[in-house]
Amino acid sequence: MQILKDRILNEGKHLGNGILKVDGFINHQVDPALMNEAGKEFARLFNGVGATKILTAEISGIAPAVYTGQHMGLPIVYARKRKPVTMPDQVLLTLAPSHTKGRTVELIVSPEYLAGGEKVLIIDDFLASGATILGLVKLAEIAGAKIVGIGALIEKTFEGGREALSYLNVPIVSLAAIKSFDNDQILFE
């Protein structure tokens, strides 16, 4: 998606160690117009997968997931990283390493919002190593739900996440695929 690539080139910054700072328009300050366009594009690309629900991880996956859900007419569920007091004692829980946090995080979903028989489309901000998305896949599997597609705003193809998820045999879509940070220059596929 060219408008996303342009924003990454103009405002994104490689911080080293494969970390891309895009917090001016995706994951701290959010550009609603950009997320709306991304949601439209995901809705177009995943139109035929038969999804009944969208699953993402808090916090940065929420904006693209909400706009995708709006354009697809689907509810979204986001995995929390801390269990609130309002959540039941029995939860769906898995652990996933976080590249940006530098530690393992919990991913928690209430079973009342993710159940067996659901057809789940995962939408997130990044696809890098695939660790967070694999955690979301595990939550869906624990619930008895089926993954029908995976979408990410930005993919860092050099980190191997797509390959780690290929066993699922579902469409995997990224709107901006980065092949390298060559001398801190962002290069797209």
Positions of predicted regions on the chain:
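Short glycine-rich phosphate-binding loop at a beta-alpha junction
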Residues: 50-58
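Structural motif
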Residues: 52-53, 119-121
